[in-house]
């Protein structure tokens, strides 16, 4: 039996003043895990807390694209191989719920209007997301990784994208191996400059490194030094098959928090 744990972040560059907001999401996940809930449930519900918090660029706090539109991405992957992701959704305060709904479906990815039609058919809330200009201290993604008593690991990520990008742009969040990666024994989530994360296949490479060397922090340091373009601001969170989760960033700030159950 594994010891439940969770780690979450509020985005690269978000600033330490948002740490308490991240800690609230971690507390929700911890409560679910302590009561015997699954890693998927814990990761999704904690991600919903972050999506519902307007200080983050995800869900209700998502920023405008260059044309004034508000387009939301989200993803989830589980260590048993299941995944779901959605791209460029409108009128969806909690896109992570749509992504999670795909975990047990034949398809695992949806985009745009088709994603919203699917969500309508599944009874997932449809409501306007008004959007906002970016804050001075940018934040582009939220993410949660949870491990339950069975040893299952799940990673949930969500974003409103970058405010200086066009409406058709796809960042790292919904791309497997880039903004997220989970396999047996490890889960990784990334945040920051999506193009750099994508070109570096960052989350997959960090996960492979962790499984190879067995050290979360050392693997993150290696990735930030060796897998990215110069000056790309990026943060990473990771959780292994045992022990606590960890977070690390080369940006000025990345609020992150972790929890592990008592033995």
Please place each PLM-identified region on the residue numbering.
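Alpha/propeptide regions of enzymes that mature by internal proteolysis
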Residues: 1-263
């Amino acid at each position: 039996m594994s010891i439940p744990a969770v780690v979450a972040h509020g985005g690269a560059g978000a600033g330490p003043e948002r740490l308490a907001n991240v800690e609230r999401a971690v507390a929700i996940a911890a409560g679910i895990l302590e009561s015997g809930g699954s890693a998927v449930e814990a990761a999704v519900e904690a991600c919903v807390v972050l999506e519902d918090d307007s200080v983050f660029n995800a869900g209700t706090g998502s920023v405008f694209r260059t044309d004034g539109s508000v387009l939301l991405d989200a993803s989830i992957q589980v260590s048993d191989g299941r995944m779901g992701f959605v791209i460029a959704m409108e009128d969806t305060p909690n896109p992570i719920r749509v992504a999670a709904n795909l975990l047990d479906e034949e398809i695992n990815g949806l985009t745009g209007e088709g994603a919203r039609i699917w969500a309508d058919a599944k009874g997932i809330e449809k409501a306007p997301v008004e959007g906002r200009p970016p804050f001075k201290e940018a934040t582009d993604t939220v993410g949660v990784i949870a491990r339950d008593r069975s040893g299952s690991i799940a990673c949930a990520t969500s974003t409103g994208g970058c405010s200086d990008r066009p409406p058709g742009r796809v960042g790292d969040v919904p791309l497997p191996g880039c903004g997220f990666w989970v396999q047996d024994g490890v889960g990784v989530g990334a945040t920051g400059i999506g193009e750099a994360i994508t070109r570096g296949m960052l989350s997959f490479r960090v996960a492979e490194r962790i499984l190879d060397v067995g050290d979360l922090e050392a693997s993150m340091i290696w990735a930030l030094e060796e897998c990215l373009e110069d000056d790309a601001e990026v943060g990473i969170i990771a959780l292994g098959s045992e022990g606590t989760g960890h977070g690390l960033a080369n940006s000025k700030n990345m609020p992150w928090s972790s929890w592990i159950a008592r033995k």
